[in-house]
Protein backbone atom coordinates (compact mmCIF):
# COMPACT_ATOMS: atom_id res chain seq x y z
CA UNK A 1 0.00 0.00 0.00
CA UNK A 2 3.08 2.27 0.21
CA UNK A 3 2.96 3.45 -3.43
CA UNK A 4 -0.70 4.39 -3.25
CA UNK A 5 -0.29 6.06 0.14
CA UNK A 6 2.56 8.33 -0.96
CA UNK A 7 0.69 9.19 -4.17
CA UNK A 8 -2.42 10.01 -2.13
CA UNK A 9 -0.34 12.33 0.10
CA UNK A 10 0.95 14.09 -3.02
CA UNK A 11 -2.61 14.59 -4.30
CA UNK A 12 -3.64 16.07 -0.94
CA UNK A 13 -0.68 18.50 -0.97
CA UNK A 14 -1.40 19.65 -4.54
CA UNK A 15 -5.12 20.04 -3.80
CA UNK A 16 -4.28 22.29 -0.81
CA UNK A 17 -2.29 24.80 -2.91
CA UNK A 18 -4.37 27.96 -3.40
CA UNK A 19 -4.47 29.03 -7.09
CA UNK A 20 -3.41 32.63 -6.29
CA UNK A 21 -0.24 31.43 -4.59
CA UNK A 22 0.54 29.29 -7.65
CA UNK A 23 0.04 32.27 -9.99
CA UNK A 24 2.51 34.43 -8.04
CA UNK A 25 5.16 31.77 -8.62
CA UNK A 26 4.56 32.00 -12.37
CA UNK A 27 3.03 28.56 -12.71
CA UNK A 28 -0.13 28.47 -14.80
CA UNK A 29 -3.23 27.50 -12.82
CA UNK A 30 -4.37 25.46 -15.82
CA UNK A 31 -1.14 23.45 -15.67
CA UNK A 32 -1.72 22.70 -11.99
CA UNK A 33 -5.32 21.71 -12.68
CA UNK A 34 -4.04 19.29 -15.34
CA UNK A 35 -1.58 17.83 -12.83
CA UNK A 36 -4.42 17.36 -10.33
CA UNK A 37 -6.42 15.41 -12.92
CA UNK A 38 -3.42 13.27 -13.85
CA UNK A 39 -2.58 12.54 -10.21
CA UNK A 40 -6.18 11.65 -9.41
CA UNK A 41 -6.25 9.27 -12.41
CA UNK A 42 -2.94 7.74 -11.29
CA UNK A 43 -4.25 7.34 -7.75
CA UNK A 44 -7.43 5.65 -8.95
CA UNK A 45 -5.45 3.28 -11.18
CA UNK A 46 -3.02 2.51 -8.35
CA UNK A 47 -5.85 1.72 -5.93
CA UNK A 48 -7.68 -0.46 -8.48
CA UNK A 49 -4.51 -2.43 -9.23
CA UNK A 50 -3.53 -2.81 -5.56
CA UNK A 51 -3.60 -6.48 -4.55
CA UNK A 52 -5.94 -7.19 -1.64
Swiss-Prot record:
Biological role stated in the UniProt entry: Identified as a multicopy suppressor of the slow growth phenotype of an rsgA (yjeQ) deletion mutant.
Protein name: Protein YabQ
Gene designation per UniProt: yabQ
Amino acid sequence: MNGATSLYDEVIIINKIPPKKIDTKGVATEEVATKKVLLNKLLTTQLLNEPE
